[in-house]
Each structure stands twice: as structure tokens, then as C-alpha cells.
């Protein structure tokens, strides 16, 4: 208390310094800061704030008698937020306070928390109901002596809160609910009225907080209800207006248990009390004093499933008869939300603007029509005034704000997509008045209509502009009659617009025969309330010169495309081009796009078949001396991807050229032969066929196109009588893609321009004669195309059949003349047989082959690299000191040394004495036997082990170990043998084999060579040689022959055995090594 006494003077002083006082009418728009102190609206004045998103009141709000304070949101995307959060602030209203969010698509927040709330005037909180709002007026000291309205245009799950929870409020006036559920959280005193109207609910949440029986709960319509939670002892509530199907109930099911409980409900006709018993138990019952005169047989148990309420199955009772006493209680004086100052003025302004535009036939700009959005709220409020209760003392002024702003578009050249959006907010009248050239004036008057308001019938008289092909167009006038109870609706008139508009393609070609379009359209808007017809007749003498199409010197060819039925009655003024072509493009199945992509054969298949669901937009427009016959037959559909992806060795060449539709016969029966040869002058540049139709003295010869169009200047016969075969010769695209050879990946995507056949068939015919505009837009095939030119007979009697029956479009992609880029990526293994010349050794792969014919090249060791050649398999060759490989110091295995046997030779007369151990020494060959391999026979044995030693060759020399030196490749070295060393041990020698390559070739030679110093030694190495550039070194040194090597995935390196391998030093060194190795066993025996 002491703190309050200290703080309160400072607070009052602060508010007095920063107070806002309004003495005269004021309208503020846009953002404004209200958090500056107390606000007082003095008598005779109002303050209307429009489109201020956040209004934070930090001081006391006082509205005096005959004053008003309004906060309104006209912008539908703006959510109002009005807050009073000062605990010492208060609200006192003796005039009108209205927080109006009926136009907002965002739920407004009205959170008024203060020390006290006293309403002696009218207080309105409203929302559109698109999103749940917040209705909360919380104060410890809460009094309503006037009118408090909580309104939603559409009910949501939001629950209104009045007073401080568990506290008390006094209601001596009227609390009126429109489309709103009120949740009682306080006790209620006073003798006022709480009215539920337009699908509203009074929800008594806690009967622990009593409601005085002098407080009347009124059900104003059949959709409203009362629900009480029966958690305490039964109480009695005064209810009026019960009947016509509205409901009273509790939050427990109304059941009657036979023999145990009481009936679910009972009505006492003498006292007028209706008792509802939850679960048939008396303690869970509530009593409703509904009045006398009710018939119990008309009572029925139902379920109240209103939004925001706990759904209780069979918890309510309705009365299926009229209210016996239908008088509205005297304390229930309800009104709907009034219009806010500053909004009704804008609505009347826009209404007068649209009315003026409808009478003077001027084109209302978009800025004027956009101003109609500001009238929605006012017209909505005026609508509610027409439906208020009969006993309302103050009828709401119905500001005739039904602003149907009339768009009258004067004749507009070119595409005019002017959207005549006449927004009418009062009732949901969607007046769609398209202008004659399909000016889509969808004036969607999306008003938020409260229930039981007068509905305006949307009489949208659409003015179908079927523009006749004569030189003078007179569209029929459209009469829009909207029977509205709101006010005078303005006249909508849309004058006929020349040129293509957004929806109807009425392209009128105005030529030198001056066509005068005189649209005399009179629109009559009639108001059912005023009973005062408003006629305004406009004669729009707009000679709309549509210079959008051809300026024909003597012909006026007007093609009118009304929706999809291409009536195209192109009446040429002096040239009689009567195109009787019914051009029946029958797409019986899929609309085949026939996109043949041929790289090379540029298939300028001009005759572009537009088979888009049989929409042959064959706009053959011969403008001036330019016969721009854009017969756009665009076979859109079946895209024929022609993938041709041959992956692997399979030549999968799928050349998908799928043309899975009909045969694309393109028969176009007419003399319009259009033999689409590859010599087609119609240069299909990026699918644009220039169809040069040279009209020399009337003979329009479409060279290369699907259209001959024989136009003669004087009597321009243009005789399209025939079959319009459109044979597409040259673009046949068989695309057989015979990938002869390897894997032939043939990823040939036929990149020839996708051949979408969108060739626009421009047909630039020179047509030196009369100018035939022939805009034949054959939609669905029945285009009449009567071009009455100079004498320009142009008898296109073609049935232009374009019969894409099933769209099979075989289109085999023959690629005749096309360059198929067969990319042929050989992904798999390829086995190739190669003839290797005599002095060349091919070192390929890691697989070792055996040289069967071992040449006796001089001093060549053909052994391989670092693998040790401990051939355990011994060559059983005999003969003393015979190498099976001949030549001076040649090894036959992979290269021979001098006197070396290619296999493992035996020592002095030893057979297969191959050392089982791997030959040691730096670079060892796996040879065995001193005095190697037997005589004249060949030691063809190959050691099974791989030759050891770094960089060893497998060559055998006479009396050599397999001694390979370090650093030997598997090539040929001088004086090396890849042969085998001495008999029983593995021969070691420092002699080097000339074999290069780090791979080792270890052949164990089991074959015996006999004979003295022959040039054979067919040692074959069975081991694998690996290392640098490993592989079988096949040397055809001795006998030239062909060696077949199996090639793996690795690269092939051709190693040429050098001629320098025959040097004398190597021969000597090899002989010395052989003798040394042969003597070692003798010494140690």
C-alpha cells in the first residue's frame, strides 16, 4: 500500500506529461507509435488508425461520450496486435472503441491487461477467422454496462477470455458473440445478457464460479449452443431463444441407466426447467430455465462438435421446433462491427471511380482497380447491418460500398492480359466478366460474408468474343446484373479488344480495307435493394487496327480462335482463298514427337507436324508477298531418344529411335506433296524450317517442305488437292547401326539436332500476287480457312490427314548420309593374333608364353627379370655339352646363350639335372647341367619355377648356370643363356643373362634336346614373368615364326632385341661361366 502511494503520483505525472489528446477527427495510416502515454479521445472527435501492425498502449485509454477510437487493418497480410500491458493502466470507454481485423488473413492479437476495464459505450473486437485470434480483456476490476462485441467472420478454435481468471466480472449490458466461443473463467454478476449468434458457443467452464440467474444466456440463431461442465452441484442457468435446432448441453454423455439411474433429460412444463443428467446421475446434472411452452417429444439428444469445445458424444439436447417465446430479451441489444472512419470513404471513392469508368467507356487502370481492396471491410460491415436483429435500436448505416470497380478495356492492340479484378467485399459475388477479346476480368469479389447476410448472386455474364472474320467486328454487349442487397453495383463492361488477349486468340488482321470495330456494349448493373436500374450505354468507336499480323494490300484475313474450336472463317476481302482443308490430324494414340536425331543427315523435315493432341495449328500466314506458311505440325510426343549405347563388346547399339506411336504417315491428303527430300531447301536450322515457297507468278512451290501451296497472283489457285504425303524421304533414319568389330560402344546419340520436327514451316513464299494472309489455325482439324483474297482462289481442298495413327513412326534411322559416330568403346578383353617379324620380341602382359621355335640368335638371352628361375623340372636332355639352342651362345628358352640348351640340360651326359634350388648369385638363371642339354636334340624343357635373380634372363648358355647378372632385362643379352646351370646344384654364376625386364621367366624344361649345337631349343616358360614390362618374351631369333600371345588388359610394349647382342665379349664371358660352373661339381665330387 505504501509502495502504491509512492509510485502512483509519479505514474500519473508521467502519463500527464506524455498524454495524447484528440479534439478533432483524425485518420492516421501506416506505422505509428502509440507507446508514449495516456490517450484521450474527447467528445465529438475520433481517431482512426489504419494498417498499424503493432499498437502498444502504455497508458490509460479514455474515450469520451460521442467520441471514437478505431484501429483497423485493411492489408490482408497485416496482422493487428493491440496490447495494453500496464498493470496500473485502465480502459474507460463511453463512446466507440473498435479494433477491426476482419480483412486480415493473420489472426489478430487483442490482449488488454490493466488495472480496470469499464465499458459504458460500444466496444468491438473483430477478426476474419482465417486464423485463430486472441480475444482477451483481463482486469481485476471489470465492468460492462454497454455493448461488448466479439466477432469472427468464420468461427475458429479460439476461446475468448473476459476478466481475470477465477475473479469476477459484472455485466449489466450486452456481451454479443458472433462466430466466437466464449469460455467463462470468472463468476458473472449483474442482470445483463450474453448472446450467442452465428455459430457461437457460451462455454461455462467451471460451475464453481457461479453465474447469476439474473444473467440471461441468449441463443440468437439455430447454429449456436451452450455447454456447461457439471463438476459441482447442479446449478440453474437462465436461457432464452432455445429452439429451431440450437443446443444446450453438458460435457458428459446423456445416458440413462435402466433401474439404476434417472432419465438423461427431463423437462418440467410448469417451471420451464430442462434438466440434463450426465451418465444418468443426478449429481452430474445441470438445469436450464428455458421457459414454458416446449413439447418434450421434440427434444433430441445430439452431439455438439463446435470448434474449440471438448467433443462430448451425445452430450447435448436440441429442440426440433420453433422457440415458443421468440421475443428477444430486453437486455440483449446486439450490433455488428461498424465501419471505421477512413475506410468507407475509400470504398465510396473506388465505387464512384468504377462507376465513372463504366459510363464513359474509359479503360480503368490497374492502380484504380487496386484501390478497391480497401473497400472490403466497409462493405462487409454494411452487409451485416442488413442482417441484424429486428430489435436493434441503432441500425448500422449500410454504407453502399459494394465496389465492383468496372474495368472497361478499350480496344487494345497486342496481347492484353488486363485482369479486371473488381473486388467486392460485402458478399462473395464472384463477378467474372471477361471482355470480348478474352480480357480475363475475373473480378473476384472475395468478401467475407457473415452468416445470414444477404447473398449477392454472382451474375457473371461472360462476353464471349467470337470475332467474326468480316472487316467490321461488333461484339455482343455484355450485361452484368448482380442482384445485391448492399447497394448500387456498378456497371461492368468490357469492350471488344482487337489482338490476341490472354485467353482468346482473336488476332484480327486489319488490311487496307479499313475495318472499323465498333463495339457498343452496354452493361447494366442492377441493385435489388435500390430497385433503380442503372443503364450506361457506351459506343466504343475504337477502330482497333491490329497490326500484329500481315498487312495485306487487298485481303483482310481474320482468323478467330475461340477457345479450341478453330472456326477460322478467314474472310479475305478480294482474294477468294477458300481453304476448305479440314486437315484432320488424327493422333489416335500418343502424339509422336518423332525426334530423330541424325548427326550428319540434317533431315530438314519441314512439314512440321504439330500433332499436339490433334491441335494442328497450321497458321499458314501469307503476309504480303511473303507466304509465311507456318504450318507448325510439331509432332510433340514420343521423343525418340535414339540412345545407341553399345557398352562392352556387346554392340548394344540400342539406337532407341523409339517412335513408339503411329506410323506418322503425315498423309495430309492434298496436292501439297511436300516430298521432304534431303535436298530440302527448307533449311531446318535448329528445327526452324524456312520452307522457301517461291510464288513465281502464283505457283507457290514449297521446295522440300510438306506443302506445295501453289499460289497464283491473278487467280492464285493454290490447289492443295492431293495427299500432302510428307514422306520425309532422306530423313528416314533407319539407324541400323551395324557395329561390325569390337565392342563398338556406338554411343551415337544421333546428335543431329534432335529432329523434334518442330520445323515451324515458315514457308517464306514470295507470292508476288495478292497478299494471302491465310492464318489457318486448324485446331482439332476442322479449320475452314476461307481466304477471300483478290482472286486468290487458293482452294486448299486438302483433308490434310496427318494421320499419326498410334504414332508408330517406324523412323528406322537409316543414317543415309549421316555420319554415325560409332564411339565403340571396347570395354572387354580382345584376343588378337599378331605376326611378329623375326628380329622383334614383343614383351606383353604378365602372362608368360613359351617360345616354341627358339631361334639361335647370337648371344641372346631371352630370359626375364627378377624372378628366380629355380626350375625344379629338369630337362632330361642328354648328350655331352650340347646345348639345344644353337647359334653362338644362344638360349632357346627365352633366348639362348652359346651352346645352351633351352631346357634344363644335363651335365656331362646328364638328363634332367636341374637344380631344385633356385640359382644363386647375382642374377641367377634356373638352368642345370654342366655341359648342357643334349646334343642335337633340343632342350625344350621349361623350368616350372620362375627365374630368380634380379633382372635375370632365362637364357641358357653352354655349361652355364642360369646365371643371370644383376640388372638384366628379359631381352637378349650377349652370351647369356636362359638355360639351366650345372647338374645337381643350382648353378651360380656371375655371368649375366642379357634378359631385361624385372619380370622373371621361369620355365622348367622337361623336353630334351639332342643333337649338337642345334638352333632349336624350344624351351617354353610356363612360369609367369612379372616385373617391369613383364610378359612372355617371345623371340623368333632362330627360326622365324609366329608366336601367339594372349593379351591381358595391360598395355602392350614391343621390345626389340637389339642386334648388338652378338658381341664377342659376351660370348667369351658366357663360355667362361659355363666352364666354371661345370668344373665346380667335378671339384667337389
UniProtKB/Swiss-Prot annotation:
Membrane topology (UniProt): Lipid-anchor; GPI-anchor
Biased composition (Gly residues): 847-1010, 1018-1028
Compartments, record wording: Secreted, Cell wall; Membrane
Signal sequence, start to end: 1-19
Keywords in alphabetical order: Cell wall, Glycoprotein, GPI-anchor, Lipoprotein, Membrane, Secreted, Signal, Virulence
Keyword Membrane: yes
Coiled coil location: none
Acidic residues compositional bias, start-end: 529-538
Glycan attachment residues as annotated in the record: 659, 782, 854, 860, 864, 874, 882, 886, 890, 896, 900, 910, 924, 932, 938, 952, 960, 964, 968, 976, 980, 992, 996, 1008, 1016
Positions of the propeptide segment: 1063-1085
Disulfide bridge positions per record: none
Amino acid composition bias (Low complexity), ranges on this chain: 342-528, 539-828, 1031-1052
Protein name: Cell wall protein IFF6
Source organism of the structure: Candida albicans (strain SC5314 / ATCC MYA-2876) (Yeast)
Taxon lineage: Eukaryota, Fungi, Dikarya, Ascomycota, Saccharomycotina
Gene giving rise to this polypeptide: IFF6
Amino acid at each position: 500500500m505504501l509502495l502504491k502511494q509512492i509510485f502512483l503520483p509519479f505514474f500519473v505525472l508521467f502519463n500527464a506529461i506524455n498524454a495524447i489528446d484528440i479534439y478533432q477527427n483524425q485518420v492516421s495510416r501506416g506505422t505509428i507509435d502509440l507507446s508514449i502515454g495516456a490517450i484521450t479521445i474527447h467528445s465529438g472527435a475520433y481517431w482512426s488508425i489504419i494498417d498499424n501492425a503493432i499498437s502498444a498502449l502504455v497508458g490509460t485509454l479514455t474515450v469520451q461520450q460521442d467520441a471514437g477510437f478505431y484501429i483497423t487493418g485493411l492489408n490482408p497480410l497485416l496482422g493487428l496486435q493491440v496490447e495494453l500491458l500496464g498493470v496500473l493502466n485502465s480502459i474507460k470507454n463511453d463512446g466507440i472503441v473498435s479494433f477491426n481485423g476482419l480483412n486480415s488473413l493473420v489472426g489478430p492479437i487483442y490482449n488488454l491487461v490493466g488495472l480496470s476495464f469499464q465499458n459504458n459505450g460500444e466496444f468491438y473486437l473483430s477478426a476474419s477467422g482465417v486464423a485463430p485470434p486472441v480475444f482477451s480483456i483481463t482486469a481485476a476490476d471489470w465492468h460492462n454496462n454497454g455493448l461488448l462485441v466479439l466477432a469472427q467472420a468464420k468461427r475458429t478454435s479460439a476461446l475468448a477470455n473476459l476478466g481475470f481468471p477465477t475473479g469476477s466480472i459484472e455485466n449489466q449490458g450486452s456481451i454479443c458473440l458472433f462466430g466466437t466461443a466464449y469460455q467463462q473463467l470468472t463468476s458473472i454478476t449483474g442482470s445483463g445478457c450474453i448472446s450467442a449468434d452465428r455459430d457461437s458457443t457460451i462455454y461455462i467452464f467451471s460451475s464453481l464460479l457461479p453465474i447469476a440467474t439474473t444473467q440471461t444466456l441468449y441463443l440468437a440463431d439455430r447454429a449456436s449452443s451452450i455447454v456447461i461442465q457439471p463438476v459441482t452441484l447442479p446449478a440453474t442457468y437462465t436461457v432464452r431463444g432455445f429452439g429451431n435446432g440450437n443446443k444446450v448441453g453438458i460435457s458428459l454423455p446423456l445416458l440413462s441407466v435402466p433401474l439404476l439411474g434417472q432419465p438423461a433429460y427431463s423437462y418440467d412444463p410448469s417451471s420451464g426447467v430442462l434438466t440434463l443428467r450426465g451418465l444418468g446421475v443426478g449429481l452430474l446434472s445441470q438445469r436450464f430455465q428455458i421457459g414454458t411452452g416446449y413439447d418434450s417429444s421434440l427434444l433430441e439428444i445430439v452431439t455438439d462438435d463446435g470448434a474449440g469445445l471438448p467433443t462430448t458424444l451425445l452430450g447435448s439436447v436440441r429442440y426440433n421446433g420453433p422457440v415458443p417465446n421468440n421475443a428477444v430479451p430486453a437486455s440483449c441489444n446486439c450490433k455488428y462491427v461498424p465501419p471505421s472512419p477512413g475506410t468507407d470513404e475509400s470504398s465510396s471513392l473506388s465505387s464512384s471511380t468504377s462507376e465513372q469508368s463504366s459510363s464513359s467507356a474509359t479503360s480503368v487502370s490497374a492502380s484504380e482497380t487496386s484501390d478497391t481492396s480497401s473497400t472490403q471491410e466497409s462493405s462487409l460491415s454494411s452487409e451485416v447491418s442488413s442482417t441484424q436483429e429486428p430489435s436493434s435500436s441503432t441500425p448500422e448505416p449500410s454504407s453502399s460500398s459494394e465496389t465492383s470497380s468496372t474495368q472497361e478495356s478499350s480496344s487494345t492492340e497486342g496481347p492484353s492480359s488486363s485482369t479486371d479484378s473488381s473486388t467486392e467485399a460485402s458478399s462473395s459475388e464472384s463477378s467474372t466478366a471477361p471482355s470480348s477479346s478474352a480480357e480475363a476480368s475475373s473480378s473476384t469479389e472475395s468478401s467475407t460474408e457473415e452468416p445470414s447476410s444477404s447473398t449477392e448472386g454472382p451474375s457473371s455474364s461472360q462476353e464471349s468474343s467470337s470475332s467474326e472474320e468480316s472487316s467490321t467486328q461488333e461484339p455482343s454487349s455484355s450485361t452484368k446484373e448482380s442482384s445485391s442487397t448492399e447497394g448500387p453495383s456498378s456497371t461492368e463492361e468490357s469492350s471488344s479488344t482487337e489482338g490476341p488477349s490472354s485467353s482468346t486468340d482473336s488476332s484480327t488482321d486489319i488490311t487496307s480495307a479499313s475495318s472499323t470495330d465498333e463495339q457498343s456494349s452496354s452493361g447494366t448493373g442492377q441493385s435489388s435493394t435500390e430497385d433503380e436500374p442503372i443503364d450506361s450505354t457506351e459506343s466504343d468507336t475504337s477502330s482497333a487496327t491490329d497490326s500484329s499480323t500481315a498487312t495485306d494490300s487487298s485481303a483482310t484475313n481474320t482468323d478467330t480462335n475461340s477457345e479450341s474450336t478453330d472456326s477460322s472463317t478467314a474472310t479475305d476481302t478480294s482474294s477468294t482463298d477458300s481453304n476448305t482443308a479440314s486437315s484432320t490430324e488424327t493422333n489416335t494414340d500418343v502424339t509422336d514427337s518423332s525426334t530423330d536425331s541424325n548427326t550428319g543427315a540434317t533431315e530438314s523435315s519441314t512439314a512440321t507436324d504439330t500433332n499436339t493432341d490433334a491441335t494442328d495449328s497450321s497458321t499458314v500466314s501469307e503476309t504480303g508477298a511473303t507466304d509465311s506458311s507456318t504450318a507448325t505440325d510439331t509432332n510433340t510426343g514420343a521423343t525418340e531418344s535414339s540412345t545407341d549405347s553399345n557398352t562392352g563388346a556387346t554392340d548394344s547399339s540400342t539406337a532407341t529411335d523409339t517412335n513408339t506411336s503411329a506410323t506418322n504417315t503425315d498423309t495430309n491428303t492434298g496436292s501439297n506433296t511436300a516430298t521432304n527430300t534431303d535436298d530440302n531447301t527448307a533449311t531446318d536450322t535448329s528445327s526452324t524450317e524456312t520452307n522457301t515457297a517461291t510464288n513465281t507468278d502464283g505457283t507457290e512451290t514449297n521446295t522440300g517442305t510438306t506443302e506445295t501451296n501453289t499460289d497464283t497472283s491473278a487467280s492464285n489457285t493454290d490447289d492443295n488437292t492431293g495427299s500432302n504425303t510428307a514422306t520425309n524421304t532422306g530423313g528416314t533414319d533407319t539407324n541400323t547401326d551395324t557395329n561390325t568389330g569390337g565392342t563398338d560402344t556406338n554411343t551415337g546419340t544421333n546428335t543431329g539436332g534432335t529432329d523434334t520436327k518442330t520445323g515451324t514451316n515458315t514457308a517464306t513464299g514470295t507470292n508476288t500476287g495478292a497478299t494471302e494472309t491465310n492464318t489457318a489455325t486448324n485446331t482439332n482439324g476442322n479449320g475452314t480457312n476461307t481466304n477471300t483474297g483478290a482472286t486468290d482462289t487458293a482452294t486448299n481442298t486438302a483433308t490434310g490427314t496427318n494421320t499419326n495413327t498410334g504414332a508408330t513412326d517406324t523412323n528406322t534411322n537409316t543414317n543415309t548420309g549421316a555420319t554415325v559416330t560409332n564411339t565403340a568403346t571396347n570395354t572387354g578383353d580382345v584376343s588378337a593374333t599378331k605376326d611378329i617379324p623375326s628380329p622383334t620380341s614383343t614383351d606383353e602382359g604378365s602372362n608368360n608364353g613359351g617360345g616354341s621355335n627358339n631361334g639361335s640368335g647370337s648371344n641372346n638371352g631371352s630370359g626375364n627379370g627378377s624372378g628366380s628361375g629355380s626350375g625344379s623340372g629338369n630337362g632330361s636332355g642328354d648328350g655331352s655339352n650340347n646345348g639345344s639352342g644353337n647359334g653362338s651362345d644362344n638360349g632357346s628358352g627365352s633366348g639362348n646363350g652359346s651352346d645352351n640348351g633351352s631346357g634344363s640340360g644335363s651335365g656331362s651326359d646328364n638328363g634332367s639335372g636341374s637344380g631344385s634350388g633356385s640359382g644363386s648369385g647375382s642374377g641367377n638363371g634356373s638352368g642345370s647341367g654342366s655341359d648342357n642339354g643334349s646334343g642335337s636334340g633340343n632342350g625344350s624343357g621349361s623350368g616350372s619355377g620362375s627365374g630368380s635373380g634380379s633382372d635375370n634372363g632365362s637364357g641358357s648358355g653352354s655349361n652355364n648356370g642360369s646365371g643371370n647378372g644383376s640388372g638384366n632385362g628379359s631381352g637378349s643379352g650377349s652370351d647369356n643363356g636362359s638355360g639351366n646351370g650345372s647338374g645337381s646344384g643350382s648353378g651360380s654364376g656371375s655371368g649375366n643373362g642379357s634378359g631385361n625386364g624385372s619380370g622373371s621367366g621361369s620355365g622348367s624344361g622337361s623336353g630334351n634336346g639332342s643333337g649338337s649345337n642345334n638352333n632349336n631349343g624350344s624351351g617354353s616358360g610356363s612360369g609367369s614373368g612379372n616385373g617391369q614390362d613383364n610378359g612372355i618374351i617371345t623371340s623368333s631369333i632362330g627360326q622365324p615364326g609366329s608366336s601367339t600371345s594372349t593379351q591381358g588388359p595391360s598395355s602392350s610394349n614391343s621390345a626389340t632385341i637389339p642386334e648388338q647382342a652378338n658381341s664377342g665379349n659376351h660370348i667369351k664371358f658366357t663360355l667362361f661361366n659355363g666352364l666354371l660352373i661345370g668344373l665346380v661339381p667335378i671339384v667337389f665330387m
